């Protein structure tokens, strides 16, 4: 018989840098999960993506065991990296802070495709372009 899921925890953590300090410790501790075991497994799986924020969805079972699924990095993080900017604009419709090419946009959309609610690459590109627009980043050919 399958184990019963008692909680699903969603966290966005730096790749390879999960530690028992907040936010990881309190989120997992209240469900009785072995925090160090999670940190070691997460860091091992994300070691090759250092410097990125990797969201994770942790399923906690009634016997206090857990499984986790890694998601793709947020579009905003990928856009900031491609445009080489620290943060998005605080007035995106007035002040533009960077530009990305259509090729970079396609690459980001390709990366995000499994987690987006889109069936093809063009729909994914529109979603990512909207995120870029809201950050004050323009898309050029």
UniProtKB/Swiss-Prot annotation:
Cysteines engaged in disulfide bonds, as pairs? none
Q: Name one GO cellular component term.
A: cytosolic large ribosomal subunit
**Pfam families named in the record:** Ribosomal_L11 (PF00298), Ribosomal_L11_N (PF03946)
Q: Which CDD domains match?
A: Ribosomal_L11
Question: Which key words are in the record?
Answer: Methylation, Ribonucleoprotein, Ribosomal protein, RNA-binding, rRNA-binding
Share an example GO biological-process annotation for this protein: translation
Q: Which InterPro entries match?
A: Ribosomal_uL11, Ribosomal_uL11_bac-typ, Ribosomal_uL11_C, Ribosomal_uL11_C_sf, Ribosomal_uL11_CS, Ribosomal_uL11_N, Ribosomal_uL11_N_sf
The GO terms describing molecular function are: large ribosomal subunit rRNA binding; structural constituent of ribosome
Q: Name the source's superkingdom.
A: Bacteria
Changes after translation: One or more lysine residues are methylated.
**Similarity section:** Belongs to the universal ribosomal protein uL11 family.
Q: How does it assemble?
A: Part of the ribosomal stalk of the 50S ribosomal subunit. Interacts with L10 and the large rRNA to form the base of the stalk. L10 forms an elongated spine to which L12 dimers bind in a sequential fashion forming a multimeric L10(L12)X complex.
What's this protein's function? Answer: Forms part of the ribosomal stalk which helps the ribosome interact with GTP-bound translation factors.
The identity of this protein, by name, is: Large ribosomal subunit protein uL11
Organism encoding this protein: Nostoc sp. (strain PCC 7120 / SAG 25.82 / UTEX 2576)
């Amino acid at each position: 018989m399958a184990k019963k899921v008692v909680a699903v925890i969603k966290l966005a953590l730096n790749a390879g840098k999960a530690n028992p300090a907040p936010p990881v410790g309190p989120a997992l501790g209240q469900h009785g999960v072995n925090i160090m075991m999670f940190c070691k497994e997460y860091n091992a799986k994300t070691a090759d993506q250092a410097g990125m924020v990797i969201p994770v969805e942790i399923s906690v079972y009634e016997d206090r065991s857990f499984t986790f699924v890694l998601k793709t990095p947020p579009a905003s993080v990928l856009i900031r990296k491609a445009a080489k900017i620290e943060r998005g604009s605080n007035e995106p419709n007035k002040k533009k802070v960077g530009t990305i090419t259509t090729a970079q946009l396609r690459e980001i959309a390709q990366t995000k495709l499994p987690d987006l609610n889109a069936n093809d690459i063009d729909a994914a590109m529109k979603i990512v372009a909207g995120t870029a627009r809201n950050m004050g980043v323009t898309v050029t050919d």
